[in-house]
Amino acid sequence: GGRVVFGIGAGWVAAESAVLGVPFAERGAMTDEHLEAMQELWTNPAPSFSGKYTQFSGLKFEPKPVQKPHPPIWVGGHSKAALRRTVQFGAAWHPINRSPEELRAGQAELARLSQARGRAVPPAITLRNDVRIVGPGQAVPASTHGGRVIAGEPARLIEQISELAECGVEHLVLEFLSEDGRELDEQMAAFAERV
């Protein structure tokens, strides 16, 4: 037990918010409030909460998480609001496809925000990144999320991942870019064997 990570992001696609009937401009405030509500549910034996978007009382929320006080929260995004949210609520900042330069800048901002908030230890840095093993002369596919793709021959991937570790990335969540299931299996097997 105790291996759950709670990942959350405010979202960045306005059309998704529209389908759900959620005002896109309020997504950050809603995310903050929902994080407060989740912490109340996780930690209080008789939880109650009264906010703009969420209200509850007189309920039982069981079982409580194995991790205390609650599962680690990884906050997605790379905006200033996401960094602020990470310092306020998160155990880790979890952006997608960021370059080493962007990660270093984010790390510096997390340290600044943590100090301003009186947080002794800044959040960890985790990263979700697209990855693709390619041979000489092969094109690197574009990411559906934009940003940097970890790509190249296995030795080049090792260099890129090492550079991310030097930037403070503690966990790397990979999404293999592939055309189909067969190619996905090949990419993952090659990565496991050679990277």
Language model features with spans:
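Active-site-adjacent structural elements that line small-molecule/cofactor binding pockets in enzymes
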Residues: 1-195
